């Protein structure tokens, strides 16, 4: 058993290894998006893969490399299909490289708009002002950014 650290942390044990894994993930993700047209829009999940999701909870740590390998084998190959250009199921837009990178940067900052004097409040205000301008809404009208169509409908009600 490893000796307990004087404090708990979620930081990686080795930043260089984490950096290398992160670069590999970005490279793989860009290749995945770049080659989306070479794959079917959707494919069924093989029984052997589905069975891997009926496992007991892990009780020991698993390294980030192993988790990424599991993701690459069991999750990434079997999407809904909405990032494919021939997916015509409904309005959901496709994933984009810049959208994914923007999500990554937002996740790194982990902002919230619950209060405080930080830049996320200014970003939301700016985006709302741009939308008001595009829609010719009055400058003194208000707005709110939400996470998706369901929440927008809920707020609208």
Predicted regions, residues:
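Conserved beta-loop-alpha segment that forms the PLP phosphate-binding cup at the N-terminus of a helix
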Residues: 124, 128, 141-157
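N-terminal entrance/gating region of PLP-dependent enzymes' catalytic architecture
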Residues: 2-140
